Amino acid sequence: MAASRPVVLDVQSIHDFIQYVLDNHAVPSTLVVCSTKATFLEALQGEPQSSQDEQHAINPRRLWQTPTLRLLSTSRTLKLAFCPDITHLRAYLATYTITVAKRSVEQDDALRLPSAQPIMAILNPIELHRPTSAFSAQGLNRTFSVATEAAHHTGSKLVMADIAKPHAISNLGEELQTAEARAPTSPWEEELPILNVTTKRLGELSVGRTVKIKSVAERWCFFEKMPSLDSI
């Protein structure tokens, strides 16, 4: 089956993104998390809790007991991959065709939505690039290109999402702290330099021309609102 068009989902919750992937995937599918497992669990723990969760506070040991994460951890049809840096991410994507080929014997007897299909989901690619010199249109474009190619060659639908973090740019220097308060809610609306090179000049961060991350991603993906989980 031909892969559907790559998309970026406008989603505010990691839990919602995971549930979307679980509800819409078919064999073989993969959720690529752009962080370590520990950071991933920490982010899940730090998300606003629902009224039910507030009555039963989530702690690291109980995270995988929540319905969504229990399904993820026990799923035999959706693989989970952690890529803690750009090098690991690009290497994983470059060899994804081989990885999927080794999973050709997987069976899927579960009831699926008629629209279910193989999915390659990538969570927080922007955050992975942020603290590096590749946090630029050039760097992200290269990663998006490799991801799109991997999805195409495996007949998978590429689905990306980046969950906004209030402290996202706090490590870029004191001179950016004021700008942080004015930063857009969506990471995709953020401006970034076109090239990988950044230099300090006269006490300011010189990045040259900038472009929105969304404009970079639109070369490869369509942007879609996260559908209501009740309608899936």
Predicted regions and their residues:
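N-terminal regions of ATP-driven nucleic-acid and macromolecular assemblies
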Residues: M1-I232
